[in-house]
Amino acid sequence: MPELPEVETVRAGLTPHLTGRQIKAVTVREPRLRWPVDPDLSAKLAGLEVRTVERRAKYLLIGFGHEQWLIVHLGMSGSVRVLPDDTPPQKHDHLDFILDDGHLVRYHDPRRFGAVLWHLGPPDSHPLLSRLGPEPLSDGFDATGLLHALAGRRQALKVALMDNAVVVGVGNIYANESLFEAGLDPRRPALSLTADEAGQLVQSVRHTLARAIAAGGSTLRDFRDAIGKPGYFQQDYAVYGRQGQSCPRCGGLVERCRLGQRSTFFCPACQR
């Protein structure tokens, strides 16, 4: 599933191609995504100018002014590409947004777990966004807030870190990598975190995500950015997917367990 760095990479790639462009038409080949595509979407978008391309958690937010928004989620394997407007559609190319400059924005989603939603009003008023926690790269994510969010939580620290009510966008890959950088055992109870450890974890999450964004995200299977390029952060994983290999910090062996039904990778010698 595309995580925050991948969605931010797509947002950055879309921005210069979309901002200031007008939507001429929308082609919907398959409306049955995770939630049905608005049957009147083409009529609602035709003639509107894109004012902004933003991101909240793992959602792309395309704004047209006057509180008119498209909320896009890539699901498990979705992608959004900018292509010449005469590019023939392929299998799983479900929507095209035809622009006024000879290009289109194509939504591709083999598993149809993603979403393209029309919303009137502030984005944070949408039910999918209204209860999200702070952005990890913003000032709203700090040690004090993290400790407050984890107070009373006996679940594993990694599971809590992946909860969007605690902080948004820290998916499985980046939770593993952030906890390794912070030297924290993903299995320990979330409520056991000290103030100093919370500060270190905040910095590690920010540093890990910033590095991943700079590398264009991670491409493990099929992720591509808005112009079709893969990400490269997977080349720098310290622990994720490295069970039985040497820890880059101490030389011990990376172990694997399951927490919250997700594979978890860590160094038992380095992470306490």
UniProtKB/Swiss-Prot annotation:
Active site: P2 (schiff-base intermediate with dna), E3 (proton donor), K58 (proton donor), R262 (proton donor)
Zn-finger region bounds: FPG-type: 238-272
Keyword DNA-binding attributed: yes
Single GO molecular function: class I DNA-(apurinic or apyrimidinic site) endonuclease activity
One Pfam family of this chain: Fapy_DNA_glyco
Function: Involved in base excision repair of DNA damaged by oxidation or by mutagenic agents. Acts as a DNA glycosylase that recognizes and removes damaged bases. Has a preference for oxidized purines, such as 7,8-dihydro-8-oxoguanine (8-oxoG). Has AP (apurinic/apyrimidinic) lyase activity and introduces nicks in the DNA strand. Cleaves the DNA backbone by beta-delta elimination to generate a single-strand break at the site of the removed base with both 3'- and 5'-phosphates.
Keyword field: DNA damage, DNA repair, DNA-binding, Glycosidase, Hydrolase, Lyase, Metal-binding, Multifunctional enzyme, Zinc, Zinc-finger
Quaternary data: Monomer.
GO biological process terms on file: base-excision repair
Gene: mutM
Organism taxonomic ancestry: Bacteria, Pseudomonadati, Pseudomonadota, Betaproteobacteria, Neisseriales
Protein name, per record: Formamidopyrimidine-DNA glycosylase
Catalysed transformations (reactions): Hydrolysis of DNA containing ring-opened 7-methylguanine residues, releasing 2,6-diamino-4-hydroxy-5-(N-methyl)formamidopyrimidine; 2'-deoxyribonucleotide-(2'-deoxyribose 5'-phosphate)-2'-deoxyribonucleotide-DNA = a 3'-end 2'-deoxyribonucleotide-(2,3-dehydro-2,3-deoxyribose 5'-phosphate)-DNA + a 5'-end 5'-phospho-2'-deoxyribonucleoside-DNA + H(+)
Enzyme Commission number(s) of this protein: 3.2.2.23, 4.2.99.18
HAMAP family assigned to the protein according to its UniProt record, in alphabetical order: Fapy_DNA_glycosyl
SUPFAM superfamilies named in the record: Glucocorticoid receptor-like (DNA-binding domain), N-terminal domain of MutM-like DNA repair proteins, S13-like H2TH domain
InterPro entries: DNA_glyclase/AP_lyase_DNA-bd, DNA_glyclase_Znf_dom_DNA_BS, Formamido-pyr_DNA_Glyclase, FPG_cat, MutM-like_N-ter, Ribosomal_uS13-like_H2TH, Znf_DNA_glyclase/AP_lyase, Znf_FPG/IleRS
The protein's required cofactors: Zn(2+)
